[in-house]
Amino acid sequence: MARRDIGTDDPRVRVRPGKGSRPRTKVRPAHADAVTGMVTRIDRGHYRIHLDDPSLTEDGGGDITAMKARELGRGKVVVGDQVAVVGDVSGRKDTLARMVRIEPRRTLLLRSAEDGDSAGSQKPVVANADLLVVVTALADPPPRPRMIDRYLVAAYDAGMEPLLVLTKSDLADPTELLSLYQPLGVRCLATTITESGISGIEVVRQALAGKVSVLVGHSGVGKSTLINALVPAANRVTGHVNEVTGR
């Protein structure tokens, strides 16, 4: 009896695909209908995003909540990231959009881990910011030049422009501290609290206008006071410096 050779072209033969012949599943869809926005807050896997086109939301405010799509993997999303989202972008209560893409970052501010298993590693903090506003008091608490130096290094490493804002200039002369940083080309501004408000706040406002800014500085230097003056709706809680701890 002659042997019959039935090739794989025969319609009666069903070939089960092996790993090598299976279609690739890691190709990400284009999501041509995605809309873009900036991450403004992150809370336990939920991302608050302000859309570039606020009119897409029901209230016109432009703020929505999204979850990260599985296809993005474990990549770190940080505040300031420009992202693309699909799904429900109405911004209505209890609705979730889906974040499907993280756009390339212009700048990335990193912070060094100080303890635990990740000590010595760097953690991304903020993306796409233009200014790193280093807030330091001239007194009560006294300035910390070494901390200022670390902030300046972080700003330059991130590709950001540093801005040194000196608070409480009514309590100490800023000349000595300014002499350390003005020769480096660091822009320095001084403010003080008066009975009518904060003297110098308008100059700070102009320096920040049209830019994405990050405020840093240790406890008690007046960051919250500055934020409340610049953004009254922020309603940040302010306090007094403890005479014992200096905080």
Show where each model-derived region lies:
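Short flexible coil/turn linkers enriched for glycine and charged/polar residues
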Residues: 33, 41-43, 93, 127-130, ...
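Conserved beta-strand/loop subsegment of P-loop NTPase cores
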Residues: 128-136, 157-169, 185-192
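Canonical P-loop GTPase G-domain recognition
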Residues: 168-221
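Walker A/P-loop
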Residues: 219, 224-225, 229
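Switch I (effector-binding) loop of TRAFAC-class P-loop GTPase G-domains
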Residues: 232-247
